[in-house]
Amino acid sequence: MKKILVVLVICVTSVATAQDRYTNGMQKAFQLWGEQKPTEASNLFERIAMAEQDNWIPHYYVAHVNTIHSFGEKDFEKLSKQLEKAKEFLDLAKAISPDNPELMVLEALINTAWIAYDGATYGMTLSGKNFQLYEQALAMAPQNPRVVLSKAEWEMGSAKYFGKDVTPYCKDVEKSLELFANFSNDTPFYPSWGKDRAEVVLNQCGE
């Protein structure tokens, strides 16, 4: 009986230690990102992802950091490297967590980064994919504020490109803000971004 108890204590302690390492590592990576050190943050998220191969969350953040910091990048080589890494870790996350609307939104953001860099080259092939991704994500998670916001912002961008009125999509941005107020998930470090962006986009609706 004593041996069983000792084994149980060791197992529980090992799990707790691993969880502490994960939590501390993720917090440090977010700190680096907040300090405008995206490369260092990405590298740390990547090391955590390699240690947490059954957890899609750190893989998500490797992809997210590299995607966000690709917008506005003019150097094609740097952009390609970042977005290829983003896609690599997105695919790993999708293998762990298939049919995940958060990952669908992220995939659409990766596509949008390519389109923003060169719409003439990438717009025709990736715009249709984004439409499908957002429709699929919305069907699966209509109460997810990032899904609602990202779909609305994509449609607003498309409307602006073709010289159409963006007003019909402003109500969806407003809806996303309502959803942000109530949305929660118990998974540690689950994506929570978007509210500030929704407020910016909604203000633009009034201009």
Which residue ranges define each predicted feature?
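Bacterial Sec-dependent N-terminal signal peptides
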Residues: 1-25
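Amphipathic alpha-helical repeat scaffolds of TPR domains
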Residues: 20-28, 51-73, 99-118, 144-159, ...
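N-terminal targeting signals for Sec/Tat export/insertion, comprising classic cleavable signal peptides
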Residues: 27-56
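Short coil/turn connectors between adjacent alpha-helices in alpha-solenoid helical repeat scaffolds
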Residues: 29-33, 70-82, 114-126, 158-168
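Canonical positions in the second alpha-helix
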Residues: 48, 93, 136-137, 176
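TPR/TPR-like (Sel1-like) alpha-helical repeat modules
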Residues: 81-88, 124-135, 145, 165-184
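A contiguous pocket-lining binding segment that forms or flanks enzyme active sites
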Residues: 122, 127-160
